[in-house]
């Protein structure tokens, strides 16, 4: 069936549609209240079947590449919105705008049902009328919480009240001591009120921290003074600079977008009880034009898709966007109350939008990430990538004669290594091909929870490159892949520097770049970081394995028998968990009992 025939048979139902090019690569995922009307709007049918002349250059180019169409019918536009958002995060279509800020932000909360309430941090929201939440905080939540307990005489630890005995915190005036002393509700409430003021007003918080810092310095407690100085700097850096204070209890979530020629930034600002308490931002690499409507949809859906927030605030945006009604319907269902997305009309609320736009422009202007030197653009051009790789995942494995086999994934995003996103893998496979396959399959399985990157880099040659491409194709995921390996000398690949050059493999070509080429240096830097991570994890795993092996050797189990066990069970943890019956299928019953008793 031709594309034209397929379009003419589309139902007048809500659903999600997917465009593919002639090679079967996914180009775009969209949603529709009516699949027939929406998809037909992309085309002119007479006198010639072609892209609609009213489309933007970006969408027109996409439609000209479209060869086949697939669609999924759902019950409502609301369901289509949710499915579209999920599929885009998993499958990374070429022409969809990809927003990676998919994480949940922490809140600081207090449970007022406790006799002496404490402040704690959480990402999981508990429904209770007694719990009050402050946030969300994109950064700095831990620093704020630590500062509260530094400056306010509250119960410092959860278990303190059960001891019925004064602890060190009371002696250093950081707790009123309700575990043993009589503390009135009024006295404790005073400390709670101060803590709440510090959470909502960063200026007062930083001022009080600086006062304590100077006190420590005057008393030659330089280590403590330095720690507070660093904390003040982190809290200060994390906040939008603003004099805005509504002197009211108003809450708002503000979303704005600004763009340059090749980059856009999404800025979120959170106002709670009339004060700006936190902000966050994300850079987006633009390609093939720019669709602000889609970016607003992705930004708002991505932020709220984790569940109902504890504080439901009106959402302010800088401009109207297509799909706003669908987003409001989705959020109303999620919030269990009417969601409100609006462009502010009053001067007071416009201040918030102006502030967010000012910060967005400043972020674009002052961006000092590595892409400013053009290296990522050059990488895209050299290797014919689909998009500029703002997020790159690099894979390597490490073992010693098949023992302590591990893999590592390093992550490079927006010009820096994102070590919080690194992953390490215990691998069961014996050869390097199977090890890489195991690692990549496990990463693909986690795409729903942690969306795919723009680029994979593998430490290996064309064989591993083709393996990765095959895995991605079978999963329907649209990611670029390159591989880097040492040139073979005397039929051997020498990793040691100076012995052989690095060769880079892409889907379409092989690259032997000069040693001085900065594009080679960039790929090597990412490969070396993954290798470092894999080696370090291997050393730790090997040390643990050696200690376990020594334990069994002391119990009379020979090294040959230990190797036999590892070949069967793969890891010492699996050996520990095995029953005597399972162990006796590999060794004799006497040895099985010795091993089992060794781990009791």
UniProtKB/Swiss-Prot annotation:
GO terms for cellular component: cytoplasm; excinuclease repair complex. InterPro entries: GIY-YIG_endonuc, GIY-YIG_endonuc_sf, GIY-YIG_UvrC_Cho, RuvA_2-like, UVR_dom, UVR_dom_sf, UvrABC_protein_C, UvrC. Interacts with UvrB in an incision complex. Belongs to the UvrC family. The lineage of its organism: Bacteria, Pseudomonadati, Campylobacterota, Epsilonproteobacteria, Campylobacterales. HAMAP family: UvrC (MF_00203). NCBIfam families: uvrC. The UvrABC repair system catalyzes the recognition and processing of DNA lesions. UvrC both incises the 5' and 3' sides of the lesion. The N-terminal half is responsible for the 3' incision and the C-terminal half is responsible for the 5' incision. Pfam families: GIY-YIG (PF01541), UVR (PF02151), UvrC_RNaseH (PF22920), UvrC_RNaseH_dom (PF08459). PROSITE patterns: GIY_YIG (PS50164), UVR (PS50151), UVRC (PS50165). Keywords: Cytoplasm, DNA damage, DNA excision, DNA repair, Excision nuclease, SOS response. This is UvrABC system protein C. Its main location: cytoplasm. GO terms for molecular function: DNA binding; excinuclease ABC activity. It is found in: Cytoplasm. The gene is uvrC. Gene3D superfamilies: 5' to 3' exonuclease, C-terminal subdomain, GIY-YIG endonuclease, UVR domain, UvrC, RNAse H endonuclease domain. Residues 203-238 form the UVR domain. Residues 12-97 form the GIY-YIG domain.
């Amino acid at each position: 069936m031709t594309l034209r025939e397929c379009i003419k048979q589309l139902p007048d139902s809500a659903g999600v549609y997917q465009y593919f090019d002639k090679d079967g690569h996914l180009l775009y995922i969209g949603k529709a209240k009516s699949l027939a009307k929406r998809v037909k709007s992309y085309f002119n049918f007479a006198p010639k079947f072609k892209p609609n002349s009213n489309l933007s250059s970006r969408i027109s180019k996409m439609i000209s590449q479209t060869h086949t169409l697939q669609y999924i019918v759902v019950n409502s536009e609301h369901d289509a919105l949710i499915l579209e958002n999920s599929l885009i995060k998993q499958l990374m279509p070429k022409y969809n705008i990809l927003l990676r800020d998919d994480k949940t932000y922490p809140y600081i909360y207090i449970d007022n049902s406790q006799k002496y309430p404490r402040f704690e941090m959480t990402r999981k929201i508990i429904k209770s009328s007694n719990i009050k939440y402050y946030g969300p905080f994109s950064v700095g939540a831990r620093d704020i919480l630590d500062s509260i307990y530094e400056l306010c005489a509250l119960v410092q630890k959860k278990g303190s009240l059960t001891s019925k005995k004064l602890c060190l915190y009371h002696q250093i005036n950081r707790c009123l001591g309700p575990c043993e002393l009589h503390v009135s509700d009024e006295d404790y409430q005073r400390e709670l009120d101060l803590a709440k003021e510090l959470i909502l007003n960063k200026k007062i918080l930083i001022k009080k921290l600086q006062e304590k810092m100077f006190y420590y310095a005057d008393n030659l407690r330089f280590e403590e003074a330095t720690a507070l100085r660093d904390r003040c700097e982190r809290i200060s850096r994390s906040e939008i600079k603003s004099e805005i204070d509504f002197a009211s209890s108003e809450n708002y979530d503000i979303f704005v977008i600004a763009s340059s020629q090749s980059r856009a930034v999404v800025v979120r600002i959170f106002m709670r009880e009339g004060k700006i308490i936190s902000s966050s931002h994300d850079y987006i690499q633009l390609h093939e034009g720019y669709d602000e409507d889609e970016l607003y949809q992705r930004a708002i859906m991505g932020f709220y898709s984790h569940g109902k927030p504890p504080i439901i605030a009106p959402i302010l945006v800088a401009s109207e966007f297509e799909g706003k009604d669908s987003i409001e319907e989705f959020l109303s269902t999620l919030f269990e109350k009417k969601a409100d997305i609006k462009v502010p009309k009053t001067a007071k609320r416009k201040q918030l939008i102006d502030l967010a736009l000012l910060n967005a422009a400043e972020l674009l202007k002052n961006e000092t990430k590595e892409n400013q030197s053009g290296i990522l653009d050059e990488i895209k051009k050299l290797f014919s990538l689909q998009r500029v790789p703002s997020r790159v995942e690099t894979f390597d494995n490490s073992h010693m004669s098949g023992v302590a086999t591990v893999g590592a994934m390093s992550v490079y995003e927006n010009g820096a290594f994102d070590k919080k996103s690194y992953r390490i893998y215990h691998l069961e496979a014996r050869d390097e091909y199977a090890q890489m396959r195991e690692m990549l399959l496990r990463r693909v399985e986690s795409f729903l929870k942690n969306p795919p990157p723009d680029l994979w880099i593998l430490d290996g040659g064309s064989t591993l490159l083709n393996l990765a491409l095959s895995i991605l194709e079978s999963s329907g995921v649209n990611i670029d892949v390159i591989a880097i390996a040492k040139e073979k000398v005397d039929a051997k690949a020498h990793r040691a520097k100076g012995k052989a050059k690095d060769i880079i493999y892409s889907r379409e070509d092989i690259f032997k770049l000069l040693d001085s080429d900065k594009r080679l240096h960039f790929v090597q830097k990412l490969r070396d970081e993954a290798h470092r991570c894999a080696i370090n994890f291997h050393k730790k795993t090997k040390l643990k394995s050696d200690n376990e092996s020594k334990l069994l050797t002391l119990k009379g189990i020979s090294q040959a028998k230990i190797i036999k066990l590892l070949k069967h069970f793969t890891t010492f943890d699996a050996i520990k968990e095995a029953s005597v019956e399972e162990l006796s299928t590999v060794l004799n019953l006497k040895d099985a009992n010795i091993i089992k008793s060794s781990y009791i």
